[in-house]
Amino acid sequence: MSDRPGVRFESTIPIKMRDGITLYSDLFMPKGNGKYPVLLERTPYNRTAPFSRGLSLDSITAALSGYVVMIQDCRGRFESEGEFHPFVNEINDGHDTIEWIANQDWCDGNVGMFGGSYVGATQWLAAMSQPPALKAITPGITASNYHEGWTYQGGAFELDFNLSWSLIHLVSANYENLVNNFGAPPDKIEELTDMADRLMDEYSHLSLKDWPALKGIGDFYYRWLEHPEYDDYWKSIAIEEHHQNIDVAALSIGGWFDIFMGGTIKNYVGM
């Protein structure tokens, strides 16, 4: 993507995390040499996709209005290195990314975050670590607890949501990462695509922990099955357990018929 009048675009910017893993980001920023507030989106859904650049916030309009917009692939997603374990790495990775931003000569020291669903989760999780430069978040349609209300419901594994989300959004769409980082052969990619087209057949596979499709490429799915109870694995990443540690302005956005409405209300009340 080329520069637009008044907007400078920089692609595939490497940002190293505390453990040496590199995450990649794109920047939309005003042309000039000033210092600007920064709006950050951290996504598992491909930072270069049109909806990442324009659904929650129009990146070009924001840059023309005097903001820097950074969109980053989460760990293990698309071009970013590492292995993707939903939620687990977003606390430190969010903190490290915000610290990196705050140290750039184009940042005025103020960072905000935006986006919904999993992208909303990355905001709450980053805020839990209290990076000094983070001043505000706008999490939309996301949960307060990733055990009850996301992965489990009343003690039952949310098979429909978990399987479809993992297979369609997190694995099949991540072709380049599967090939480069996991060495997945073409027939494996074809197998996953076929499964995504016939999900109803996959729902009937028993036992759940023996479902072979995600072995070695989406091990988080099996880790969720290993933690059916609300144990320390879940508590460490549960927003509602850490509201007292979140000291930034938060605009919570929900929908009355959204699956995460309960979590949206809990986060609002908890703050």
What residue ranges belong to the model's regions?
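Proline/glycine-enriched tight loop/beta-turn segments at coil->beta junctions
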Residues: 21-23, 30-39, 107, 245-246
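Alpha/beta-hydrolase fold nucleophile elbow
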Residues: 106-118
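Short beta-strand/loop motif that positions the catalytic acidic residue
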Residues: 246, 252-254
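Mobile cap/lid helix-loop segments that gate and shape the active-site cleft of serine hydrolases
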Residues: 49-51, 204-241, 248
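Cap/lid segment of the alpha/beta-hydrolase catalytic domain
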Residues: 30-103, 151-152, 157-159
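A catalytic-pocket lid/entrance helix-loop region that shapes and gates access to the active site
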Residues: 114, 121-190, 256-257
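Active-site-adjacent alpha-helix of alpha/beta-hydrolase-fold enzymes
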Residues: 262-271
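N-terminal cap/lid segment of alpha/beta-hydrolase-fold proteins
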Residues: 1-32
